[in-house]
Amino acid sequence: MGSLTGRVVVVTGASRGIGKGMALALGAEGAFVYVTGRTTTPGSHPLPGTVGETAAEITRRGGTGVAVAVDHANDAQVAVLFDQVRQEQGRLDILVNNAFSIPEDLTEPRPFWEKPLSNWEMVDVGVRSNFTAAWHAAKIMVPQKSGLIVAISGYVGVTYTYGVVFGTCKSAVDRMARDMAVELQPHNIASLSLWQGLTFTERANRNLARNPEMKKLTVTNPLIGCSPEFPGRVIAALAMDPDIMRRSGGTFITAEVAQDYGVTDVDGKVIPSLRAERGAPIWRPIA
């Protein structure tokens, strides 16, 4: 029996990438995991993965996976998701806000005025979507007087990376997690933000293949980067912490939280913090 058996989880944006990895890690601990995403048909996205495939793998690993097709820019679809969770489970223990609209030109070294104005859609699905999902989740969590809401962010919150909109989004979700914590504290619900570094997702692996110099860096320094499941393993540890409220409102480097709990990556590797190289979080816990 896993450490999260009986826990109900929603992971947004889990067709592939970090979202899929986190969902698999939480499912491997026995959780009942609702996974959301827009990709339902194999081959309909340039990168592999569907929500159905993620859900099926969760179940194979010992959890229970349920795929729900959701466009997180569509408020009505998000409402249906949380209605389904409420009706089927009657509770929600963990919300992982991961859905993010990633433009194809995100990593291109061009200034903001030379990129499409549509890149602002990262704010719609990346900031507003976090708020919308948390708004619905809180309506389930507050009556039960428990819950954990996790935002997925990164060092980009304080260090310039990939342009103006990307940094704006991640800074915003860090602050949102803190202010939500203030309002959720009386209800015993924790809200926090986790900073990820390089994660070997399908997209990252494709980009590394196109950038030999960056790929060489990961080979010469094997400690750089982690699997998509690593943050999910950390979230599982957070969820099992009986004193989780002491962290509420804070922004944390995932690697440092992992070291606090003795969590390693799937291959046993200890992921290092990049605090010295990339910067430190601004927001401390409110407690």
Outline where the language-model segments fall.
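Short-chain dehydrogenase/reductase
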Residues: 2-89, 101-113, 118
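Active-site loop of short-chain dehydrogenase/reductase
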Residues: 7, 63-64, 91-92, 141-155, ...
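Rossmann-fold scaffold of SDR-type NAD(P)-dependent oxidoreductases
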Residues: 12, 92-104, 126, 151, ...
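Catalytic Tyr-X3-Lys loop
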Residues: 93, 113-132, 146, 150, ...
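A short, exposed helix-loop element centered on a Lys and neighboring polar residues
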Residues: 134-135, 178
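C-terminal helical subdomain
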Residues: 193, 213-287
